Amino acid sequence: MGSHTIQSKGAIALIVVAAALAMFMSALDGTIVNIALPTISSDFGLTTSTVSWVSTIYLLVSAGSLFLMGKLINVAGYKKIFILGFLLFTIGSFACGFLPVILGSFPLLLVSRVFQALGGSIMIVIAPAIISNYLPDEKQAKGLAIVMMLASLATALGPTIGGLVTEYLNWSWIFFINVPVGIFAIILGFIVFPKKTDEKKTTMKGFDGVGAGLIFVGLAALLFLFSEGSSLGWTSLPIILSIVLTIAGIGGFIIREHRARDPVLDLRFFRNPSFVIIVVINALLFGIFAGANYLLPFYLQLIQGLSTFNAGLILTALSIGLMIAGFIAGQVYMKLIGKLKYLLMGGTLLVAAGFFLLSRLHPWSGLGIVAAGLVLIGLGLGFTTVPITTMILKSAPPEKAGMASSISGLMRFAPMTIGIAVFNVILIAGVKYLAGVNGIVSKPPADIAANILTSGFDLCFFIGLILAAVVFILCFFVSEKRLAMVKETVSE
């Protein structure tokens, strides 16, 4: 149990609401903005590459600060950091919608996004951590299921909500809608946490600020590398520099943390093979999920001719599958302790089946095939995400719950960015190759282009199928007994 376990049903419900709000809003803001970028670009007279920094800077700051936020949770306590996270997020959201419009300054939008990203980073880390810390063991899987389901729903609905808000109001309201939710969450934070919430487990004395700086630079450079590599060119100076910074930042961080008295990340977590396997499984699953979620709107709009709104409706099939399976996984988790790897295997097989269907798409394929593939992937993710997240959090002692939550958050956040970039590279390379060797000349050019592009999509989804097979094999090596030993290792 966590160090402040609560038993009251009402208090448990409020804790779950607080965690769900944090995860939902942080996930929603990761996808709601992208669809408004063309409008923002037009309003400020910006190029596509310049306006993309609205999304890029949020990504870099959020990912780079995850481990720092995990450390702050352990130092200051859940209540203070929860309120701080929503305060930064709410102020940043209001500033994003207000200051750039009033003052006509695009740089102010980027500065405001930094504040919003810092708040979002706290929310990503603290949501699963408060579930692990406050809920009884038998309630944790159910609580995490609700939190993760809402996060997935927010990710899927973000573009649709963003499109509707931009079309019928204006892009500023994409940020303004966060404000009342943020105020409500701050009020909730003052009343929901037990009085002893802020009992300190660690202090900032001896805090490894250099390590925090190194991992921030390393992770930010890594995500910049993958998010901008295709557009800037893999041999361009910014990308080469980001490779150098990635190696220097992450390499320097690992060396530093081995020597630090009070490390930002306890590397002893990764001495346990089962912990490493669980983290890799989590990363691979979220990577291929993000890749599919990124590519399918292009297939639905360019090949099937759907509108943005209708394409978004098809994509909600994934969220439906995830919510159903997540609910079931939360209910059966406690009954399957000792046999959880079989739940992971079953979920992975469903993910693989979904990617198999998507890898067989044609320009004339029915939308039912796409929806079925998405439902299967969603079901598979639901059956794997809840037990994986729960196992990661349970592997940490209470004083390092924030650290474990940071690892869990990073292994969702970073692989999604990398997965999108990798699938994009595969698509471009596949289309170029197919266009070069395809000798079909009897069909209209538009039909040939559609066939080639669809074949590129199929190649990406086939790679997703292969990676799902790799995950299935890794599941055989998951040992819950060995995973339970992590807590003893990092507590020494």
Place the predicted regions along the sequence by residue:
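Helix-boundary and loop/linker segments of multi-pass membrane transporters
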Residues: H4-I12, I102, M204, L232, ...
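C-terminal membrane-cytosol helix-exit motif in multi-pass small-molecule transporters
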Residues: P180-D198, F216-E228, L245-R259, V471-S479
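Interfacial helix-cap and linker-helix signal at transmembrane-aqueous boundaries
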Residues: I40-S41, L72-I73, C96, I161-L169, ...
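12-transmembrane solute porter fold
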Residues: L14-L21, L28, V33-I35, T48, ...
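Intrinsic disorder in cytosolic terminal tails and internal cytosolic loops
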Residues: M1-A11, D198-T203, P445-I448, V478-E492
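Structural signature of transmembrane alpha-helices in multi-pass secondary transporters
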Residues: S26, S55-Y58, S62, Q116-A117, ...
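Transmembrane-helix bundle of Major Facilitator Superfamily
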Residues: G2-V192
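Flexible interhelical linker loops that connect adjacent transmembrane helices
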Residues: T5-I6, I186-F216, H258-P273, M334-K335, ...
